[in-house]
Design a protein with these regions (language model features):
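Rossmann-like flavin
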Residues: 1-33, 48-49, 56, 62
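C-terminal helical cap and adjacent loop that interface with cofactors, partners, or active-site loops
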Residues: 2-5, 389, 393
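Patatin-like phospholipase A catalytic core
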Residues: 3-23, 76, 81-82, 298-310, ...
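C-terminal segments that line or cap access tunnels to active or ligand-binding sites in enzymes
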Residues: 35-65, 101-104, 108, 132-140, ...
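Short, conserved active-site loop motifs that form the nucleotide-linked donor/cofactor pocket
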Residues: 72-73, 369
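Short, glycine/acidic-rich hinge or "gate" loops at secondary-structure transitions
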Residues: 76-77, 404-413
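A conserved short coil-to-beta-strand element within the FAD-binding core of flavoproteins
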Residues: 76-103, 135, 139-143
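A recognition module on extended beta-rich or small alphabeta surfaces enriched in W/G with H and D/E
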Residues: 102-133
Length: 413
């Protein structure tokens, strides 16, 4: 086997940390790891690209606008709760949906985007003024994306095969399958094997806004390319300087940042078969755990990245931008912390001997069901944008019944 020095080298650690391969499933399937490393050397243009705005604004808003212009109908605030099969267990027969909110009278369709400095952006909360229940959602601080929300749905719908759909393209991530696809799992050994063997993990992240720029924080290589660094101490083993996004944000001149730091890492997950969505405090408990992790990181560990932000007394909290001008660690309340524990938010791992259990887009075992996403057998077997794009193309190929090559789904040699 490899020596301890090799196992703890930057390259090996980077490969494991990049796909959050830690906790109880700290393995990385050897063939996939080797192929991914080789594919990384096959990049086009650059090894990685920096988005010029948030991912929702750079990727999903344009996707939405293009699809909208092409006639796709969107139904927002509709949550899939169950995928039902026909009596023969061969087709998806019904899709049960919870209607979380409805549009105000006179509004024909929900417009999800709002303008920030001329850029169509996704908001962090619903645009309440368009919703009949908008004021109640706002007053109660409801997060409709949370599976633990106490919110009472506005209604229900059941989509019926032959009336509402013919083909189903299932793009909801694997983490939600134990919740919404119980009938599929019970009817198919292949689905049961996929759900049991393709593991997931929750993730945690922070975004910090600093008054000083990168040089002021003490990073010694500030004159070079803004850093994307890793691996480092878990769980926050990576750091991306995203200060180029400041121009996309709206800050008062008297209280604006000069540096933005992003980091993310794994978090202990819940067993999907034991989820109890009646515990409405679960998201707060998870977020408190993230806050504790960030507080720990901003102690001694952060000194390596931001030496000038630390003194003998500890982290210099007054360097964090805070419009409320809080004291000490209270300034963390004005930063962005996130615990990704919702079933669809769980990251897909590439544990040893797991890829063989992934299903291809058109080999679900059900005649009218296709699946897509970075969690299927798309040829990459790694949770990433590239895998999701390849899977989307594979699904389109299956729907169109065409035969065309998709770059990345197969080895080039």
């Amino acid at each position: 086997g490899a020596s301890r020095i090799t196992l703890n080298s930057a390259m090996i650690r980077f490969m494991y940390d990049l796909i959050f391969s830690v906790h109880g499933y700290s393995t990385y399937e050897a063939g996939v790891a080797l192929r991914t490393a080789m594919r990384a050397a096959d990049y086009k243009g650059a090894y990685s690209f920096r988005m010029q705005a948030g991912m929702g604004d750079t990727i999903f808003a344009p996707f939405y606008e293009v699809l909208k212009k092409r006639g796709v109908r969107f139904e927002f605030f509709h949550k899939v709760e169950n995928i039902g099969l026909d009596a023969a267990k061969k087709n998806v027969e019904t899709i049960e949906i919870a209607v979380q909110a409805t549009l105000k009278q006179g509004i024909a369709e929900y417009n999800p985007l709002f303008d920030v400095k001329g850029l169509p952006c996704w908001p962090s909360t619903p645009l309440y003024e368009q919703l009949e229940q908008g004021q109640a959602l706002k007053d109660q601080g409801i997060n409709l994306e949370s599976y633990w929300t106490p919110w009472q749905n506005a209604g229900r719908k059941t989509l019926q095969r032959g009336r509402d759909f013919d083909i189903v393209i299932q793009g909801i991530p694997l983490g939600a399958m134990p919740v919404i696809a119980k009938e599929l799992i019970a009817a198919s050994a292949a689905w049961q094997n996929m759900v049991e063997n393709v593991k997931t993990t929750g993730t945690q992240a922070f975004q910090l806004w600093f008054y000083p720029d990168l040089a002021g924080l003490g990073w010694p290589f500030w004159m070079e390319e803004p850093p994307i660094a890793g691996p480092y101490l878990r769980p926050f083993g990576n750091w991306a300087d995203m200060s180029d996004l400041i121009t996309r944000e709206s800050w008062p001149d008297s209280n604006s940042p000069n540096n933005i730091a992003y980091s993310c890492g794994p978090i202990e997950q819940l067993n999907p078969y034991d989820w109890n969505f009646k515990d409405h405090n679960a998201p707060r408990t998870a977020l408190d755990a993230v806050r504790k992790s960030v507080l720990n990181f901003l102690g001694a560990p952060s000194q390596f990245w931001w030496p000038a932000a630390n003194t003998e007394a500890g982290f210099s909290w007054d360097l964090l931008v805070d419009e409320k001008n809080g004291n000490g660690a209270a300034r963390l309340d004005s930063q962005y912390l996130r615990a990704n524990i919702n079933p669809p938010d769980l990251y897909i791992l590439t544990a040893k001997d797991s890829s063989k259990y992934r299903l291809k887009t058109d080999q679900t075992g059900f005649e009218n069901l296709l699946i897509t996403g970075d969690w299927i057998d798309n040829g990459m077997f790694v949770g990433c944008v590239e895998g999701a794009v390849i899977a989307g193309k594979q699904t389109a190929r299956a729907v169109l019944k065409q035969d065309f090559e998709i770059f990345g789904e197969k080895d080039r040699i």
